[in-house]
Amino acid sequence: MKPSARRLYLRSRGLPGALAALLGTAAAAAWAARWLVSLPDFDHTARLPVVILGPLLAAGAIGTSLHTPSDELDRTAVRPWWPRRLAHLLAPTALAVALLALAVPGHAEAFGAPAAVRNTLGLVGVTAAAATLVGARLSWLPPTFYVGVVYLAAPSDAGGGAVWWGWATRPGPEDGAWAVAALCLAAGTALYAWRGARHVSGEA
């Protein structure tokens, strides 16, 4: 892809705005993590809201950039679109992972960088899958609904299968939570690379 065509592609998908949103999200997450830990009677476990909401906002920013201005042109293109879709999804995801890992350093055994990385990967996968079903502009809704439910309902221990259905609220090192997040990322990425985002009337 030529540089001019690459710039046009990035602008048409709104990627500059999405990248700016990722930087802002990471900065806010870093500030919130330090503030929560500094409060009296709080410790590093108080960072749970940060390792959930930070990845959720990052996934939403990435998801809204997955729209296509013209799905008809995409379908009739000479070259397959799946490599570009794959790069489009994974490049900002890698950036989000790096930024949010830096935002919550230390205490890997609880709600530190591993939990932030896992939640970013898993929620990006959920968002990518949602983009293929409801469109990129609304792709933030399903992961937001999921996060809201599990944040309120998931127990503090892993009983009752919470490590599976409440994976986003689990401490960083738990293998079961990582397995679910990896499955979400793999399924969402494959679905988006194959189908692309659903075109919804009014998207440009």
Task: Go through the PLM ranges and name each one.
Residues 1-47, 145-146, 157, 163-204:
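Hydrophobic alpha-helical transmembrane segments
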Residues 79-90:
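Juxtamembrane helix-loop boundaries in multi-pass membrane proteins
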Residues 136-158:
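Juxtamembrane non-transmembrane "cap" segments at the membrane-aqueous interface
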Residues 34, 40-68, 89-144:
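Secretory targeting signals
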Residues 84, 140-141, 197:
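Secondary-structure transition/capping residues
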